[in-house]
A protein has these predicted regions:
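Type-3 copper protein
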Residues: 1-164, 251-540, 742-782
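Acidic, low-complexity/disordered tracts enriched in E/D and polar residues
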Residues: 124-228
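Acidic, Ser/Thr/Pro-enriched low-complexity segments and adjacent helix/loop capping patches
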Residues: 165-199, 216, 706-710, 714-718, ...
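Hydrophobic residues embedded in beta-strands of well-ordered beta-sheets
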Residues: 207-208, 273, 599-602
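Short amphipathic beta-strand/extended segments with alternating polar/hydrophobic composition
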Residues: 209-220, 408-418, 609-618
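Catalytic cores of large soluble enzymes that bind and process phosphate-bearing ligands
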Residues: 217, 230, 387, 391
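Short capping segments at the starts of secondary-structure elements
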Residues: 227-237, 241, 247
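C-terminal structured domains
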Residues: 493-725, 732-733, 744, 749-775
Length: 782
């Protein structure tokens, strides 16, 4: 920004759009937003609280009463069939062990004994707080709903019964891949399998280029085999073409083909990319096999797996889910999958199928609600844009250093070379990116007084004037994906109808609705794709993630699932299985890196295009940047901060684990009185969320609920044993329980949040530039 509201430098979009609403500073919000929520009513976990009992005088009588209350609460949770059904989907091995046995004995009217009771009470309470207090987007315990932002002043309106409108089960990609590998081992199938070049390898000028290896000149026999590979021909067809070209013995051609496979240059077999229906992609490949005696048997085995996976969506109740998942496992065995290929995943809680659901809720958010976000959210997004630009500068400086170092050791540097040399930077950003985050917090400290001794309520117009100076416009955006950011916004509503927005997280340089789960559960997926196409009007360069890439799954991003047809370019850095729709991907070894006017450019000349290296690495940049948006560094106590009617920072506390007064042993303090006194002395409210080292997500704690305090004590105790200085973070629950607005037909309340997409008015200067003329050789083995 130049210091005057609305004035920007850089490349401004000229697109006139009706699919967005406008915010301050040129920012826009998609009109469609996802509603994420808890799957079980908040009242289920509220019933764990016994405030009146805890207020009684300490002593043995109170301790006995608390233990009796815990037993009754545990029994009530075990009897909750919906909770145990959620547990069966998430952790079937656990659900089918002591929870099932205990529930069966309760149902029979007995008073069952439970070994290791205190620990197991905490385990069940931990699952309960997740299903009741954490906003999710998975299964029926995190069913996806949708909201629409409209121009009318209608406040908050919603319709629907609040339950599940649609349930769909999907086969995991890894399970489909295990089936493919099993079918490939069927006698008589090998010569019918397709052969393709390793996605990151390239063949040009008589040389084979592989990642992390020097180029190798191939022999006449290898050349004949490689020339015959076009990504479609089968083993038998490749061998026939090679034999016709060389006149060599068939056994020699086969040996060379296998040698190239074992070296990693070639891949033989079915492609199973990440997709919501990987079994259908596999089926299409099997249907192309020419021999019906082989083809029909493979299809029958695959169809058995697909049918079992589809039927799992109809399972209701923990026992039925366990049975359905067992049927899927049996179908995998029947298809030839080994225990080694599937058991390891199952032992880590990865079921071969997953469930995604559409919640029976439709929300309308009126302009009178969104208008209150215009200035505060616009300021936050300005600082997110600044953050992304600074990260880009820091990462490119590191990439340039690596590129120059590589250039002293070879004649040309490929994208594969640079990615390997700068792997640490692309994975974490390194110290330079940490310094950018610190700079962000220092700049925000000019707006938010670090020494505040009470909650801050700031006026948006004053904050805007400061933000214009603190977060100036960086000029053209540095990579395409940084045009989109995803704020998670919670809405609180009091009994008298007053509302207040709360910022949960702001995901920088990432559209979190690109996850496949949102596309499959959207009523109109084309709307999401069309909005993406307009946001990415200049194109985008996207890596094709291998199946084993960290974080890559069929249901979440990466890989992206809102690709506008023909708009993106793709490149491959590992042995991926391609894009499901068959888009051509450029090998990383076929992209050479050059410095032009101080910027690194990747040229895929054999494919006819080039792009800035930051664009090639854009998805990695987004992964580095997405969670950096933290406005304040940790401190023992930080007060709540609002800009106009948006809470941008909730009240929070941080402590070394060794200073939290947890009992030395489980059950050593039935009422956890010292923990409650500690929280009260620190000024904490009754309802908080806590994050401890080793836990991926924060968890809910009610200081009036002994079972939830036991869960807190266990987590803190483990953290302190590992490192007494490990930091425990506590944040107020906001909206508070009495401000939850989402209800079902029975009036039960649920936690919820809106996942929105914000779009910058600025765009990249350029993404893809046409260079050269694609060569025939460059198309080999795509």
């Amino acid at each position: 920004m130049t210091g005057q509201r609305g004035r920007m430098t850089g490349v401004l979009s000229r697109d006139v759009r009706d699919d967005v609403v406008r915010l301050d500073g040129g920012w826009r919000l998609w009109r469609v937003a996802a509603l994420r929520s808890a799957g079980l009513p908040f009242g289920v976990v509220q019933e764990l609280a016994v405030p009146a009992l805890l207020d009684q005088p300490a002593g043995s009588d109170r301790d006995r009463a608390i233990r009796a209350a815990r037993t009754a609460q545990f029994d009530r949770l075990i009897r909750n069939e919906v909770l145990r059904e959620a547990l069966a989907w998430q952790n079937p091995a656990l659900a089918d062990s002591w929870p099932r046995h205990y529930a069966d004995r309760l149902a029979a009217g007995g008073e069952p004994h439970l070994a290791n009771r205190a620990y197991r009470e905490v385990v069940l309470a931990r699952y309960a707080q997740r299903y009741c207090a954490r906003n999710e987007s998975i299964g029926f315990f995190g069913a996806v709903a949708w909201a629409r932002l409209v121009d009318a002043d209608c406040g908050l309106r919603y319709s629907g019964a609040g339950g599940v409108r649609r349930r769909t089960s999907f086969l995991e990609t890894w399970a489909a891949a295990a089936v493919a590998q099993a079918l490939e081992r069927t006698p008589g199938v090998f010569d019918l399998l397709p052969v393709r070049l390793h996605a990151a390898c390239s063949v040009a000028g008589g040389m084979v280029r592989e990642p992390r290896r020097p180029p190798v000149r191939y022999s006449g026999l290898a050349g004949a085999v490689l020339t015959a590979v076009d990504g479609v021909r089968t083993v038998g067809a490749v061998l026939a073409h090679a034999a016709a070209a060389t006149g060599d013995d068939a056994d020699e051609d086969r040996a060379e083909l296998l040698r190239l496979r074992d070296r990693g240059v070639l891949r033989i077999g079915f492609r199973v990319p990440h997709h919501e229906r990987p079994e259908l992609l596999l089926r299409g490949q099997i249907e192309r096999l020419p021999d019906p005696s082989v083809r029909d048997g493979l299809l029958a085995a695959l169809d058995g797996v697909a049918a079992a996976a589809t039927a799992a969506a109809d399972a209701r109740g923990a026992a039925a889910v366990t049975t359905a998942l067992g049927e899927v496992s049996r179908s995998l065995v029947a298809a030839g999958c080994t225990a080694e290929s599937t058991g390891r995943r199952a032992s880590h809680g990865r079921t071969p199928v997953y469930l995604d659901c559409r919640r029976d809720v439709d929300v309308t958010l009126g302009a009178d609600l969104i208008d209150g976000l215009a200035t505060p959210l616009g300021v936050l997004l300005d600082s997110a844009r600044w953050l992304a630009a600074e990260v880009a500068d820091a990462v490119e400086a590191e990439l340039r250093r690596s590129w120059r170092w590589l250039l002293t050791r070879r004649d040309e540097v490929t994208l594969a070379d640079l990615q390997f040399a700068a792997g640490d930077v692309l994975a974490t950003g390194g110290q330079a990116v940490r310094e950018v985050q610190e700079d962000l917090q220092l700049r925000w400290s000019e707006i938010i007084s670090a020494g505040a001794t009470a909650p801050l309520h700031l006026r948006g117009d004053r904050v805007r004037a400061m933000a214009d100076a603190l977060f100036p416009s960086p000029g053209p955006l540095r990579w395409a994906a940084s045009r989109q950011h995803s704020p998670d916004l919670l809405l609180g509503r009091t009994a008298d109808g007053a509302t207040c927005w709360v910022l949960g997280e702001l995901h920088v340089a990432m559209n979190t609705l690109e996850s496949r789960l949102f596309r499959t559960q959207c009523d109109d997926p084309a709307e999401l794709v069309e909005s993406t196409a307009r946001d990415m009007s200049r194109g985008r360069v996207v890596p094709v993630y291998p199946r084993h890439a960290a974080g890559a799954t069929a249901r979440t991003s990466p890989p992206t699932a809102l690709d506008p047809p023909g708009r993106y370019r793709y490149w491959s850095y590992d042995a991926d299985d391609g894009r499901a729709e068959g888009a051509v991907s450029v090998p990383a070894t076929a992209v050479t890196v050059h410095e032009v006017d101080g910027r690194l450019i990747g040229r895929a000349e054999g494919h006819g295009w080039s792009a800035p290296v930051l664009e090639f690495f854009g998805e990695f940049l987004s992964a580095v940047t997405v969670n950096l948006f933290t406005l304040r560094p940790r401190a023992p106590h930080l007060y709540r901060v609002l800009i106009d009617d948006l809470v941008i920072c909730r009240e929070s506390w941080s402590f070394p684990a060794g200073e939290v007064p947890v009992p030395v042993r489980p059950g050593g303090d039935a009422g956890y009185q010292r923990l409650r006194d500690w929280g009260r002395a620190a000024g904490m409210p009754r309802h908080v969320f806590v994050r401890t080292p080793g836990e991926r997500k924060p968890y809910y704690v009610d200081f009036a609920a002994p079972l939830l305090l036991a869960n807190l004590a266990r987590a803190v105790r483990r953290a302190a044993e590992a490192d007494p200085q490990a930091v425990i973070d506590v944040v107020e629950m906001l909206p508070s329980p009495d401000q939850l607005w989402l209800t079902d037909a029975a009036g039960h309340r649920y936690t919820s949040e809106f996942r929105m997409v914000a779009v910058d008015a600025l765009e990249p200067a350029e993404v893809v530039t046409t260079v050269g003329v694609p060569t025939a050789e460059s198309q080999v083995a795509q």
